[in-house]
From Swiss-Prot:
Cofactor note: Binds 1 Mg(2+) ion per subunit. Binds 1 thiamine pyrophosphate per subunit.
Subunit structure comment from the entry: Homodimer.
Binding site for thiamine diphosphate: 78, 119-121, 151-152, 179, 288, 370
Descriptive protein name: 1-deoxy-D-xylulose-5-phosphate synthase
InterPro entries in UniProt: Dxylulose-5-P_synthase, THDP-binding, Transketo_C/PFOR_II, Transketolase-like_Pyr-bd, Transketolase_C, Transketolase_CS
A single BP term in Gene Ontology: thiamine biosynthetic process
Biological pathway: Metabolic intermediate biosynthesis; 1-deoxy-D-xylulose 5-phosphate biosynthesis; 1-deoxy-D-xylulose 5-phosphate from D-glyceraldehyde 3-phosphate and pyruvate: step 1/1
Record-linked HAMAP family: DXP_synth
Cofactor: Mg(2+); thiamine diphosphate
Record-level Gene Ontology MF annotations: 1-deoxy-D-xylulose-5-phosphate synthase activity; magnesium ion binding; thiamine pyrophosphate binding
Length: 641
């Protein structure tokens, strides 16, 4: 492997060293920073394209602003790797997303240079405004800078924050990182000149003087002058939308040209006016040809060869659950023209890119707008369509009020395909699908399913298509299936009914979802000790199979309920039923194994499951504490009636 020399970057311990560098050295620093980012991510995998697109911007921000005293907030955090390298974390950059290593996102507990944690989209302006107001209340003078991408600007939260900031006239700097040129491209030297001019003190001072003088003029003259300035600046800069929200707009400027960036950032740093938006245009994957040529493939990457760009992907033993979902939904849609699909800016992540290729008129990408996605689906359901709202579990949280108010309360048959349920590995706690079971099983009238394998997922999709009695959800994990044979066509499952997959006498395991394989492993281990175990596949978290659970409780000495979800989910439903029916009064030993009441950091999925006690070893240990081999015969003899 070729090692790129980085003599200037080697002198940078933290951002204070970046500020001490002369401006003529910053281009070299950016080049070396880009090379180091590529080298590090080739080893660890992670988000590459976004970080390469903000290298010059990152250098410029840390050179101009006094971080960490000045608060620099990165929206989402996909682009934060260069920032981490410049802020004292270069020595650990090759531990990104590894167990015990650096987070793939900004994180308050990791560095004082990360004033606000991120991973979900469109939060930076709200957080920045809160910090700006706190500064003003405290009589401080620090700058607050929020860097947000144009994609994140599709979320309503960003505009809610901008509307609030404009109304408060708080001194806040928003950097709009436009890396899709979806708003407006820069127009070369004239664009840079205008941006520098209108962000400068002279123009701003004259503007303030003009406002004061206009205050003494008749209202129609004052309003006319304001509209004339707005028109002139909007004509040249395209920032009328942001001006209407109360922001002073500067740009667009070339985000890869330090000669353009530095003077503008200095001007806005020194401005004492209200909120300012600087529109910076960048290119995803800048400086790395494979990423420039295919931005979507290099947004998130596994380990790759730096020279060729080839990503090292392990051969799959089975299709991913996401692909099974997509292919099955396509089959169902061929039979039912009322089936439609909705995604919130995650078509490839949810598999709906495949559905969209087959049914472009029945596929809807609503942008980063989960609240809207859910209620949009509710509207479709109200008109007799069968909408599948495909969301990651972690992003379902963003639309929860709509799930309750617009779907559940009205009993509308929206189908929720909940991907990335449970632990997700390298993306860590911010993306873990821990809470969907607790969120949904508490809602009256909701049906919630979880497949043990890809065959069951196929059946659950068919079940959801045919379920018009109310809202229904099915959750499935990240990654590959277990390799079972998939049916050619899904069959509708009886609602609220599980199945017994192994018969025993002493201890019963009731598994929801893909922990079933681990429970079967544990049952086999216990068998070698003379302990007979029943293993049941719950299939439904709501409604629970009351008949099956009562049978397990009455015919076994111990019952272990297993789910890859937080406290308050399926296990809580089972315990409530056992309590209501008095099924624990005769001495039944019950344990509900869930994710622990904490946040599990990024690591391999296997390590995360072990930490949670939900791998086969953890389940086995808990089971042995309930039924020892010597107790087996006595337990069978005292079965409860």
């Amino acid at each position: 492997m070729t090692v790129t020399k980085t003599p200037l970057l080697d002198t940078v311990r933290d951002a204070s060293d970046v500020r001490r560098l002369p401006e003529e050295k910053l281009s070299q620093l950016a080049d070396e920073l880009r090379a180091e980012t590529i080298s590090a991510v080739s080893v660890t995998g992670g988000h590459l394209g976004a970080g390469l697109g903000v290298v010059e911007l990152t250098v410029a921000l840390h050179h101009v602003f006094n971080t960490p005293h000045d608060r620099l907030i990165w929206d989402v955090g996909h682009q934060c790797y260069p920032h981490k390298i410049l802020t004292g974390r270069r020595d650990r950059i090759r531990t990104l997303r590894q167990g015990g290593g650096l987070s793939g996102f900004t994180r308050r507990s990791e560095s004082e240079y990360d004033p606000f944690g991120a991973a979900h989209s469109s939060t930076s302006i709200s957080a920045g405004l809160g910090m700006a107001v706190a500064r003003d209340l405290s009589g401080g003078d620090r700058n607050v800078i929020a860097v947000i991408g144009d994609g994140a600007m599709s979320a309503g939260m960003a505009y809610e924050a901008m509307n609030n900031a404009g109304a408060m006239d708080s001194r806040l700097i928003v950097i709009l990182n436009d890396n899709d040129m979806s708003i407006a491209p820069p127009t070369g030297a004239m664009s840079a000149y205008l941006a520098r001019l209108i962000s400068g003190r002279t123009y701003l001072s004259l503007r303030e003087i003009g406002k004061q003088l206009a205050g003494h003029l008749p209202k129609f003259v004052k309003d006319g002058a304001a509209k004339a300035e707005e028109f002139a600046r909007g004509f040249w800069t395209g920032g009328t939308l942001f001006e209407e929200m109360g922001f002073y707009y500067v740009g667009p400027i070339d985000g890869h040209n330090l000669e353009h960036l530095l003077p503008v950032l200095k001007n806005v740093r020194d401005a004492k006016t209200g909120p300012i938006l600087v529109h910076v245009v960048t290119q995803k994957g800048k400086g790395y040809p494979p990423a420039e040529a295919s931005a979507d493939k290099y947004h998130g990457v596994v380990k790759f060869d730096v020279v060729t760009g080839a990503q090292v992907k392990a051969k799959s033993n089975a299709p991913s659950y996401t692909r099974v979902f997509a292919e099955t939904l396509i089959d169902e849609a061929r039979r039912d023209d009322k089936v439609v699909a909705i995604t919130a800016a995650m078509p490839s992540g949810t598999g709906l890119d495949l559905f969209g290729q087959a049914f472009p008129q029945r596929t809807f990408d609503v942008g980063i707008a989960e609240q809207h996605a859910v209620t949009f689906a509710a509207g479709l359901a109200a008109e007799g369509y069968r909408p599948f709202c495909a969301l990651y579990s972690t992003f379902l949280q963003r639309g929860y009020d709509q799930v309750v108010h617009d779907v559940a309360l009205q009993g509308l048959p929206v189908r929720f395909a909940i991907d990335r349920a449970g632990l997700v590995g390298a993306d860590g706690a911010t993306h873990a699908g821990a809470f969907d079971l607790a969120m949904l099983t508490c809602l009256p009238g909701f049906t919630v399913m979880a497949p043990a394998d890809e065959a069951e997922l196929t059946h659950m999709i068919a079940t959801a298509v045919g379920h018009d009695a109310g809202p229904i959800a099915f959750r499935f994990p990240r990654g590959e299936g277990v390799g079972v044979e998939r049916p050619e066509k899904g069959e509708r499952l009886p609602i609220g009914k599980g199945r017994v997959v192994r018969e025993g006498q002493d201890i019963a395991f009731l598994s929801l979802g893909t922990r079933l394989a681990a429970c079967l492993d544990v049952a086999e281990r216990l068998s070698s000790l003379g302990i007979s175990a029943t293993v049941a596949d719950a299939r439904f978290a709501k409604p629970i199979d009351r008949e099956l659970i009562a049978h397990l409780a009455r015919t076994h000495a111990a019952l272990v309920v297993v789910e890859e979800g937080s406290v308050g989910g399926f296990g809580s439903q089972v315990l409530q039923f056992l309590s209501d029916e008095g099924l624990m009064d005769g001495g039944l030993k019950v344990r509900a194994l869930t994710l622990p009441d904490t946040y599990i950091d990024h690591d391999t999925p296997a390590a995360q499951l072990a930490e949670a006690g939900l791998d086969a070893d953890g389940i086995y240990k808990r089971a042995l504490a309930l039924v020892q081999p010597a107790e087996r015969r006595g337990a069978v003899a005292t079965k409860r009636a």
